[in-house]
Amino acid sequence: TFDYDTIFTSKTIEALLALLMHSGVDAIAPLQTKREANAVMFALPGVTPEQQTTVDEDWFKKPVQRVATAHFGCTFLRCAALKKTPKPWFLAKANEQGEFTGGHVDEDIAFWRAWESAGNTLGIATHVSVGHAELMITWPSRTTEGGKIQQHTTEYWNSGQQAPEGAWGFVA
């Protein structure tokens, strides 16, 4: 699977396919950081996606580590394993209040749970990473040194459509 906002090269593809062929896992994903966050998108087995986890430096000594979930930005799946995975593949589940505002299961997590329940495995390529493109708003700065101020789009929408402090001439 490939996402439009994932940045990689042909060498990335070669490395992931070689690891998939020789690691014994049914799917493999590279390390990828979540947009606007300081977190790599995967969950260790037995850890819920909401929990923050850290790994020791030794964890990266193996070229592939088993994980429970990963991001789909540049992920390879074995077709035979996909055929074993029960459908529907991408079905989100609301929380107990019937909402999707926390405590729910997103489509990708539901897929990986179904993947695992079918007896399939997922690995993270610990030495292969991909970029995650972010859309930023660039504002003219009040200072001549910087020339610009950047703001994440979600910060703009969550702040009531306000420009960041130091932006020049924004009329709200």
Regions found by a protein language model. Name each.
Residues 1-7:
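Short beta-strand-to-loop acidic/aromatic patch adjacent to the donor-nucleotide binding site
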Residues 7, 33-36, 130, 138:
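Surface-exposed, flexible loop/turn segments at secondary-structure boundaries
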Residues 9-96:
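Conserved catalytic core of nucleotide-sugar-dependent glycosyltransferases
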Residues 84-172:
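C-terminal catalytic/acceptor-binding lobe
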